[in-house]
Regions:
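C-terminal lobe/tail of nucleotide-utilizing enzymes
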Residues: 1-21, 188-273
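Extreme N-terminal, non-catalytic leader segments
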Residues: 1-42, 87
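Residue-level signature of catalytic and energy-coupling elements of molecular machines
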Residues: 33, 44, 70, 78, ...
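Walker A/P-loop phosphate-binding motif and the immediately C-terminal alpha-helix
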Residues: 35-73, 188
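Phosphate-binding loop that captures ATP/GTP phosphates
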Residues: 66, 71-116, 128
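Glycine-rich phosphate-binding loops of nucleotide-dependent enzymes
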Residues: 107, 150, 163, 269-270
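Phosphate-binding/switch loop-helix module in NTP-utilizing enzymes
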Residues: 113-161
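Conserved Switch II/interswitch segment of TRAFAC-class P-loop GTPases
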Residues: 141-148, 154-155, 166-187
Length: 273
């Protein structure tokens, strides 16, 4: 390493002299983003986009200006959750994100497609490049908190986001299943490698409440989230039930009407950073 000149831009080494700042992409000069929160999961099907939407709505209700960057290029669903169908437009300065009914700024590949049902059949590097452009080319206007809805797993796009965008904290979404320990572990270890703090765990689909008697039914079996949280020294920020009303609101683009009290602790953890 004696020949290192401090220029990491043309070096593939992961030595201790590598400056993380050198990998960050510059935000669009016309944009302003104060904090970036990534919402991740080790696997698909845990309701990560629903949790992202709930957190965004809860933060907006705190009086903060909120944006949501949909980084799940091949499986985007954020526009549907908020009933957003198009961007505001573009000019020589960049691309203006779509606006939800309450003024949240939304950016997703679906807002750029002629038909939202069209598949995005791209290879990893192209997908990663698109996510970078959502940071460098989009004019996020005075955003206090930008939530990044990540694709599941620990592949190209999560790596690109963590290296290219200055993420301030990570929320891990999981569900009460046997693989939870391994899945959360992968997400935590990746966060540690990227030197990004994990704010806590949100367990989704934690239980179903019987509409007749009110009893909690553990549909996916007994939760292991407390054991996993203790293993990684992380707080459990929320236990969200299976709620048909939330699912219906998501499908109808009405997430801004949903009660968000269940994620209050997660919102507090984000506000504390």
């Amino acid at each position: 390493m004696s020949s290192c000149n401090g220029d990491c831009s043309h070096c593939s080494s992961s030595c201790s002299k590598r400056d993380k700042e050198s990998l960050l992409e510059k935000l669009n000069p016309k944009a302003s983003v104060k904090k970036v929160i990534a919402v991740v999961s080790g696997k698909g099907g845990v309701g990560k986009s629903t949790v992202t939407s709930l957190l965004a709505v809860a933060m907006a209700r705190e009086g903060r200006r909120v944006g949501v960057l949909d980084a799940d290029i091949t499986g985007p669903s954020i526009p549907m959750a908020f009933g957003v169908n198009a961007c505001q437009g573009a000019d020589e300065d960049g691309l203006y994100p779509g606006l939800s009914r309450t003024g949240m700024q939304i950016m997703s590949i679906n807002l750029l497609l002629d038909d939202p049902a069209d598949p995005v059949v791209w290879r990893g590097p192209v997908i990663a490049g698109a996510v970078k452009q959502f940071w460098t080319d989009v004019i996020w206007e005075d955003v206090d908190y930008l939530f990044v809805d990540m694709p599941p797993g620990t592949g190209d796009v999560p790596l690109t986001v963590f290296q290219s965008i200055p993420v301030d904290g990570i929320i891990i979404v999981t569900s009460p299943q046997d693989l939870v320990s391994m899945i959360v572990g992968k997400a935590v270890k990746m966060a540690q490698m990227m030197q990004i703090p994990v704010l806590g765990i949100v367990e989704n689909y934690s239980y179903l409440r019987c509409p007749d008697c009110g009893k909690k039914i553990e549909v996916f079996g007994k939760s292991k989230v407390d054991e996993v949280a203790q293993q990684w020294n992380l707080p459990v920020l929320a236990r969200l039930p299976i709620d048909p009303a939330v699912a219906e609101a998501f499908d109808q683009g009405q997430m801004e009407t949903v009660d968000t009290q269940a994620v209050d602790a997660a919102t507090d953890a984000i506000l504390a950073i």
